[in-house]
Amino acid sequence: MVGVNFFGDFDLASLAIWSFWAFLAYLIYYLQTENMREGYPLENDDGKLSPNQGPFPVPSPKTFDLADGRKIVVPSVENEEAHRRTDLALERTSVNEGYPFRPTGNPMLDGVGPASWVPRRDEPEVDAHGHNKIQPMRKTEMKVSAGRDPRGMPVQAGDTEVVGKIVDMWVDIPEQLVRYLEVELNSGKKKLLPMTMLKIWSDRVRVNAITSDLFDTIPDIKSPDVVTKLEEDKISAYVAGGYMYAKGVKPYAL
């Protein structure tokens, strides 16, 4: 018997359990340090390095080859600066860390608080074939096969004012779902509205997040047929910020 003849009185069960705990400890260490490739070292609210960096060290830089041919090195100063916003229109409410900041201007236009956005790459998201994932339905062969087609419906703001009408639907082609509705405002401007922040009724499209006076300042897109990742973030952040900052929102009108 192996336990007697080869190992003598060595406890194989003890070896197995302690080997497992050692492996688990290493796995936790590895996963945590890999998780620290972006967003570290930790900073205080004022941007200075935090005196408490935690028990795990920041890993050494590693180069990743991306699907689009780019290379990214993380952690790196260049990568952190590419995702950093400066000169935010905010002021401290306390000298202590962890307290909220107060907007100093128009938080929805400044992109702070609930309306915050991240400086993503100013390029469209593409699918596995290199095609733009999100496109207006007028540029595709897709059609509405079930449910309500909102095109042509009036758009009702959170204060119950009608601000325009829906002229198109922007579709995530690989996912086969609608991401945005394109609205033509009474002023003639065209804007995108996130599908998750509106409700399609039988006779209108209701946007409860923002009031009629806020539609003209929804962030624009540079191309009429393309929306970039940066533009997506700004549009979604602006509309979502209205849930806190918009004044005069009324209950759903029946």
UniProtKB/Swiss-Prot annotation:
Keyword set for this entry?
Bacteriochlorophyll, Chlorophyll, Chromophore, Electron transport, Membrane, Photosynthesis, Reaction center, Transmembrane, Transmembrane helix, Transport
Query: What InterPro entries has UniProt attached to this entry?
Result: Bac_photo_RC_H_C, Photo_RC_H, Photo_RC_H_N, Photo_RC_H_N_sf, PRC-brl_dom, PRC_barrel-like_sf
Transmembrane residue ranges: 12-31
**Record has Electron transport as a keyword:** yes
**Protein topology in the membrane:** Single-pass membrane protein
- Cystine pairings recorded for this chain: none
Annotated GO MF terms: bacteriochlorophyll binding; electron transporter, transferring electrons within the cyclic electron transport pathway of photosynthesis activity
Subunit composition?
Answer: Heterotrimer composed of subunits L, M, and H.
Give the family per the record: Belongs to the reaction center PuhA family.
Summarize the protein's role. Answer: The reaction center is a membrane-bound complex that mediates the initial photochemical event in the electron transfer process of photosynthesis.
Query: NCBIfam families, from UniProt?
Result: puhA
Name of the protein: Reaction center protein H chain
Gene that specifies this protein: puhA
